[in-house]
Amino acid sequence: MKGKFLKVSSLFVATLTTATLVSSPAANALSSKAMDNHPQQTQSSKQQTPKIQKGGNLKPLEQREHANVILPNNDRHQITDTTNGHYAPVTYIQVEAPTGTFIASGVVVGKDTLLTNKHVVDATHGDPHALKAFPSAINQDNYPNGGFTAEQITKYSGEGDLAIVKFSPNEQNKHIGEVVKPATMSNNAETQVNQNITVTGYPGDKPVATMWESKGKITYLKGEAMQYDLSTTGGNSGSPVFNEKNEVIGIHWGGVPNEFNGAVFINENVRNFLKQNIEDIHFANDDQPNNPDNPDNPNNPDNPNNPDEPNNPDNPNNPDNPDNGDTNNSDNPDAA
């Protein structure tokens, strides 16, 4: 199947398996630094605030299929109050490549971190600085939380179309996760087929940099694969999939025309990858008392209040505990 192209204002939308991107020859020149599948760290420093690219001659770019999947359920509506609640971390992305400017979506999940798709970051051709992010963008002239420049990319080691992008602080020395509250991730313990969901992002068939929400239900769920019956188009790649609690349960990648749209489901493997690479990512159950990852959980071995923790003064095996049976312990009344 060949891709189809949609005109968006004076930009164009080009098809990807998982997204349609917008191209404009007005893109800035990129550096020639190379980057493979391994993350490349650049010096963290304040960056000049990027701006949303506008206009440019139409320049279609066919790369992959299945970007625009409009299903019978086409319940999409625009979000105008983009800075409110769980909408705030939803992010408009532009990638400034030598061949043009491409658009996609993402979601802020940490102080300096955003999630999107592998195929979105692939458009940088190895230069993280080519990727710009505009959290809570309202339109191409109004992005209330400014813009940020990427400095490091880490691709998911599994098959899922998922990538982590870290950003430099802006000119005011603010991080992307400080100008908006990062999204809360679901632990997905209760996620199942037929549940109501939304996909929120920046579709390419709508006015540039306008946020839209699509509503539907989960139709399939297995491993890292999630499918649903709602409609999306190119530009939605990297959009967060929210449950009814407004927690992120997956990252949208695209779909198959007349069949389904899909996302990388945040299962245990994906969750472990995210926790290993994003220190401050927040999952909904992290602060629950029975969560073994909660430092306040008395059963957490790293919790000093855990009776089995060697550094717990109440632990009889603690050498500083006067009740310690160690006869060499000067604090032990039975010591010689």
Curated annotation (Swiss-Prot):
Query: Residue ranges of region Disordered?
Result: 34-61, 283-336
Compartment(s) of residence: Secreted
UniProt-annotated catalytic positions: H119, D161, S237
Q: Does the keyword Phosphoprotein apply?
A: no
Catalytic activity reads:
Preferential cleavage: Glu-|-Xaa, Asp-|-Xaa
- Supply the alphabetized keyword list: Hydrolase, Protease, Repeat, Secreted, Serine protease, Signal, Virulence, Zymogen
Task: Cite the EC number.
Answer: 3.4.21.19
Identify the GO cellular component terms for this protein: extracellular region
Q: What class of enzyme is it?
A: hydrolase
Enumerate the propeptide ranges: 30-68
Signal peptide limits: 1-29
Repeat positions for sequence: 289-291, 292-294, 295-297, 298-300, 301-303, 304-306, 310-312, 313-315, 316-318, 319-321, 322-324
Matches recorded under Gene3D superfamilies: Trypsin-like serine proteases
Homology family: Belongs to the peptidase S1B family.
Comment field (misc): The cascade of activation of extracellular proteases proceeds from the metalloprotease aureolysin (aur), through SspA to SspB.
UniProt protein name: Glutamyl endopeptidase
